[in-house]
């Protein structure tokens, strides 16, 4: 596991060859947006907690106490999954939140060797079935496809039962990559999800990033100089969608609206990409200790 982490560190250092220590003109977020980013960071955090992936029908909870907004709502998991025998060991859940009238899909970030194998399998694969000229990270796309059919079926049933509820897809790190790719496919299928990701790596080429940007309804959150959003490197053709919500405050601090800069532009070299000292600790703190259950 340490070796795999070092491979990602090497990739991030390669990314720094094109990064510039620049920063766009800050545009703070509203209190409402901050509230949404905070809420869905806690939904992403819940995916790391094992009680949310092995007991369908229970309320969503976090044994480390890092998802109080979720725990205070009227929630029930409708489908929990941990595909240990499938490529990428994708884990997470689909839940209903009757308090906020939400259907939430939350993908777990990296925990197992299979997760890391999917992470470092970053050769491009054809994604023209998603959009013209698009190429995706091979490992992430294959991992999404391992759960796509069953999960989409469960979402379809949930949408029929909970008419008028908003569909949200979220995840941190590897889970954020799956949320992004899954979100594109679900939008193409007419489901119209909002996607919130935290510390996600790049998932495809510039054409894919532009397509995601044009679809809209993406809140891609980064934190200071977090290592993971810097990989796979832009030098080999990977790109991020826009906009980026860049948290500029440090670890273990309360984030305010003025601590988040909105960075606009596909493949921008500002925000997280403009920082020069990749930090693994920054990856764990997204409006709270997001992977405390890991």
PLM regions with names:
Residues 1-24:
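Fungal secretory targeting signals
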């Amino acid at each position: 596991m340490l070796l795999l982490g070092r491979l990602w560190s090497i990739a991030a250092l390669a990314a720094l060859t094109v990064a510039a220590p620049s920063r766009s003109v800050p545009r703070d977020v509203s209190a409402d947006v901050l509230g949404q980013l905070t809420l869905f960071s806690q939904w992403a955090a819940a995916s790391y907690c094992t009680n949310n992936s092995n007991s369908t029908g229970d309320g969503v909870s976090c044994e480390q106490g890092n998802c109080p907004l979720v725990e205070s709502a009227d929630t029930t998991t409708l489908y929990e999954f941990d595909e240990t025998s499938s490529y990428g060991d994708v884990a997470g859940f689909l839940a209903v939140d009757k308090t906020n009238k939400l259907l939430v899909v939350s993908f777990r970030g990296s925990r197992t060797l299979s997760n890391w194998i999917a992470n470092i399998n970053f050769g491009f694969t054809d994604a023209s079935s998603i959009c013209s000229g698009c190429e995706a990270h091979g490992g992430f796309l294959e991992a999404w496809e391992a759960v796509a059919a069953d999960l989409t079926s469960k979402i379809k049933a949930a949408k029929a039962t909970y008419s008028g509820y908003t569909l949200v897809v979220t995840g941190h790190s590897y889970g954020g990559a799956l949320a992004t790719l899954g979100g594109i496919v679900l939008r193409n299928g007419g489901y119209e999800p909002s996607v919130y990701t935290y510390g996600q790596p790049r998932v495809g080429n510039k054409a894919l990033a532009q397509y995601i940007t044009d679809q809209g309804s993406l809140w891609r959150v980064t934190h200071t100089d977090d290592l993971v959003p810097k990989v796979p490197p832009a030098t080999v053709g990977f790109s991020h969608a826009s906009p980026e919500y860049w948290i500029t405050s440090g670890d273990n601090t309360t984030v305010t609206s003025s601590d988040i800069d909105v960075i606009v532009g596909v493949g921008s070299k500002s925000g997280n990409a403009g920082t020069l000292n990749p930090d693994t600790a920054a990856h764990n703190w997204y409006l709270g200790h997001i992977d405390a259950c890991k």
